[in-house]
Each structure stands twice: as C-alpha cells, then as structure tokens.
Amino acid sequence: MHKKINCLDYLLFVGYLILFAWLVTKLNFYKNSQLNNSQLIIIFLLKVMAGIFYGWVGVYYGNMAKMVDTWSYHYLSLQEFELLKDNPKEYFTNLIYYPYAEGYLKFFSTENSYWNDLKVNFFIKILSIFNIFSLGNYYINVIFYSFVTMVGPIAMYRVMINVYPAKKLQVILATFMVPSFLYWTSGLHKEGLLFLGLALITYCLYFGFKQNHWPFKRILVLILSLILVLALRNFLVILLLPAVFSWFLATRWPKKGLVVFVVSYLIYGILFFTIRYADERFDFPAVVVSKQEAFIAHSGGSEVDVRVLEPTLESFIINAPQAISLSSLRPYPSDVRHILSLAAAVEIFMLLLLFVIFLLTNTGGANSKNFIYFCVFFAFSLLFTIGYTVNFIGAIVRYRSLAFPFLIIPMICQINWTKLLSRLTISEKK
C-alpha cells in the first residue's frame, strides 16, 4: 500500500524543488558547463518530471510494463530507514557484512554472491539516506535523485562540447533529450547512478589525457566513480578496463588510434577465451553463459526466445548477430505490448534513420578521434554483452540506455545538417 500524501509532503516537495532548482545555477561544476541558468533549470526539471512519470508508471502499469522494481526499492529503503532509527550499528555495517563467507569471492556469480547482492543493497542504502530528508516520500526522493544524477549528463556534456565546440545545439539535444536515456536515468533505479559513474570516469580521463594533468581531486573522483560503478554493476568495470587501456595507448600513438584500438581488442578477445586455461577462476565465457542462464530462468512478459550460448568461441561467433540485434534493434513492431514498448520501438526506428543519414552525410570534425574510438568500442562491447546475456526486452531497453550517449552524441554531431536541410529545401521547391 502506498503512503498517503499529506499537506506536509506537498510543501516539502515544492520547497525542495525550488531549493535544488536554485542550487543547479550556483554550483561551479554546472556553471562551468557553458549552459545558462535557464537551460540548467530546464534540464533539472525535465529529469524530475521524467522521474515522477517513472514512478507513476510503476504504480499504475508496473505489472504490465514490468516496472515494479522502483517501488520495491522504495519500500525496502523505508525498512532500511527504520533500521537506522532502531539499530544504527547494523545500519552502518550491513552493507559490508555478508552471511555467506565464500560470497565475497564470487565476483561474477548470480547466486550467494556478495557482489551480486551489493548492487541492490547499495542502492537501497542511498535511498534510505534520502528518506531522512524526505520523510519517506517517493516523489521527493525523485528530486534528490535528479539533482545528484544530473552531474552525469552535465559531465558528459562538458566532454562532448569540448570535442565538438561548434555543435552546441546538437550536443545539448543529444545529451539531454534522448527520451529513453532521460527516462531510465531519471527514475529511481540504478541507471542514473551508473551513468553518473561512467560519465565522471569519462570526464576525468578525457581532461586528464588532454591536459596531461592528474591532480589529486581528479584521481579521487575517478576512483570513487569506479567504486560506484563496481558496486552497482560490476561487469561494467570489466568492459571499461580494455576501453580505457586502449585509449591510454592511443594517446601515446595518436595518429594510429584506430589501429591501436583494433589490435588491442583482438588481444583482449584472445585473452577472453584463453586466460581460463591459466586460471580457471577467470573463465569469462562461462561467466557470460551463466548470466544468460540466470535471465532465461526468470519469467516475464517481455522475454524473447534466444539461441542458448555455450562457452566456446564458435558459439559466441554464431550468437553475435542475435546479440547485436537484441540489444540494438529490439523491440520490433511485433514486440509492442504497451505504450512503453511502442515508444521504444519508435525511438529505435528514428535512431536507425539518423544512423543512415549519418552514414550518408558524415562530416567528421571531432577534436579527438581517439576519444570517439573509446566511445564506440566501449558502447558496442556493452551492447554485445547485453545481447549475449539478456532475453527480456524491457531490461534490454533499460540497460542499453547507458550506451546511447557514447554513440548518439557523436552521431548527431557529425551529421551534415546544413547539407541535409539544403537538400530538403531543394526538394520542397521542386
């Protein structure tokens, strides 16, 4: 049963909304983004509205759209808040304690694993802190969450506007206005914090490599961001490491960046399939297979039939087309079951149309090609991982939202819009 909203909740909601809308115009990290106060406030309010809509969908269409998690997390955070009042010692230690001693060693496991359970426990702990100030109100927590996670898109914007300084409008639209990205990273779920971590890692590395300057603050933010990603979805760190190392090598041979990335990823691929023979604890193909088995074992309304993956090179090659199709092209029109899946299908169609336009009119123009290689290789490694392991369209749409900014922003910025618009104008005159 949902908590009844009273007048105090409304007053707190309005008060916090005004306070944080004011704060986004005062913090230096936001002020130095080249966005004016009106733009910052609009972006913040868009995130709040998306987060409220996310919660509303969870209430009225949660079972149909398979979005009950957000409210489950909220109720668990209320229990955690009560624990803070009744047993502060346990509250401050239960994130570290785990009942299965061997669970600390099961980094990739989906059962009796400290690391697998940490993603939920950590997120609930954060929400419980919000509850101290919101009195346990879900929608007030949305305001807090929007304020905190807005750092992620702003960090990505600051990187991309440095890469494409003459494309401010395109960077703004592609960073903040992609519907699925805005929706999934604004709701009370892990994606907002995950992108915060990924974006800050990208921000620190980009300006660190560019300036060849690594002050203590930058290194600290980088480490904390890695810990955040590790806590919420540990396999993302595994995907980040080869992308970051390749980027680092490319900074040493800047004119051979693409060759560096291709050769590096070929080596990573070989290690992925062979390192298990040196140490069976690093049987990465088996880990991916176990993740797929865990998803297949679940039931839901958006699952699709998939070819079962085996821990062999041949199986991964055979399943590659299915993997990229699942993660990049679904839902098809035939997959549409409700308004959210319809919206996802329309969005994918529009993005594919933009991709075709990009192929026909690509202007290049990035200040750092090696950074773009990093974006592409990391994003596609994430998409392949999703496609190999997940067979629920709803989860796929949510997970892939993290990859979108790394691909969509460069794509939008490198389309020759002047040429495209001139052709459309000529066509209209004819």
Task: Show the residue positions of the predicted features.
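Juxtamembrane segments of multi-pass membrane glycosylation machinery
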Residues: 104-144, 331-336
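Transmembrane alpha-helix segments characteristic
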Residues: 44, 221-224, 367-388
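Alpha-helical transmembrane segments and terminal signal-anchor/GPI-anchor hydrophobic tails
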Residues: 221-222, 226-347
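Transmembrane-helix motifs of polytopic, lipid-linked glycan transferases
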Residues: 22-26, 141-163, 353-357
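Hydrophobic, aromatic-rich transmembrane alpha-helices
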Residues: 20-23, 153, 323, 327-333, ...
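Extracytoplasmic catalytic/substrate-binding loops of multi-pass membrane glycan-assembly enzymes
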Residues: 58-76, 85-104, 114-126, 320, ...
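Membrane-interface helix-loop-helix junctions at transmembrane boundaries of multi-pass membrane enzymes
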Residues: 29-30, 162, 211-217, 356-377
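Short acidic/glycine- and proline-prone juxtamembrane loop motifs at membrane-interface regions
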Residues: 187-194
